[in-house]
Amino acid sequence: MAKIAKRVQKSREGIDPAKVYGLTEAVTLVKERATAKFDETIEVAMNLGVDPRHADQMVRGVVNLPNGTGRSVRVAVFARGAKADEAKAAGADVVGAEDLVEIVQGGKIDFDRCIATPDMMPLVGRLGKVLGPRGMMPNPKVGTVTMDVTAAVKSSKGGAVEFRVEKAGIVHAGVGKASFDAKALEENIRAFADAVIKAKPTGAKGNYVKRVAISSTMGPGLKIDPATLSVA
């Protein structure tokens, strides 16, 4: 514990918690302070001027990060027949129908993202209480209920990130690894921010992007000037 506390304290040296950094400087500082013995995830959090308790202020969507996420994503597909074969050929890790529903109902979830063909949704709907809280329920709004399972699987494997605003008006996501070069991280962060901006709901009033911050898994958070993200 003493070693961990010392490392955390050292990672905060040279960081001004009150300062608002430009994106390039913030990425450099975060990378320098990602000193854990594993490849830390770089995370972005955006505080939005919305109240998600109101339906017209919900923010959700999906973005394909140009440089991927750096993590291996296991994909499950609910499909039958030719579509099941298509999913397997595209690289899905788990494919099934009633059999897969039973497995998930039994508590075994060995995947990170879930896709379904439209005809499977009455069946998959039974899993709402299991998949919903984990943010895995297939949804046509984010492209996970689709007949084009090949594109959906490849997108999921290739860096697709879903986002959804939380109760406090915060939307966050992992946008890469500390091992990524700074340019790749900046491109991913800008792509994520752009997607969140484009998902601005009609009910949002006033300042939409209130605050932005980035951090590594074990490192300190740094505030970012939204203007350096091309965010208004």
Curated annotation (Swiss-Prot):
One of its GO terms (biological process) is regulation of translation. The keyword Repressor applies. GO terms for molecular function: rRNA binding; structural constituent of ribosome; tRNA binding. CDD domains: Ribosomal_L1. SUPFAM superfamilies: Ribosomal protein L1 (SSF56808). GO terms for cellular component: cytosolic large ribosomal subunit. InterPro entries: Ribosom_uL1_bac-type (IPR005878), Ribosomal_uL1 (IPR002143), Ribosomal_uL1-like (IPR023674), Ribosomal_uL1/biogenesis (IPR028364), Ribosomal_uL1_3-a/b-sand (IPR016095), Ribosomal_uL1_CS (IPR023673). Keywords: Repressor, Ribonucleoprotein, Ribosomal protein, RNA-binding, rRNA-binding, Translation regulation, tRNA-binding. Binds directly to 23S rRNA. The L1 stalk is quite mobile in the ribosome, and is involved in E site tRNA release. Part of the 50S ribosomal subunit. Belongs to the universal ribosomal protein uL1 family. This is Large ribosomal subunit protein uL1. It comes from Sinorhizobium fredii (strain NBRC 101917 / NGR234). The lineage of its organism: Bacteria, Pseudomonadati, Pseudomonadota, Alphaproteobacteria, Hyphomicrobiales.
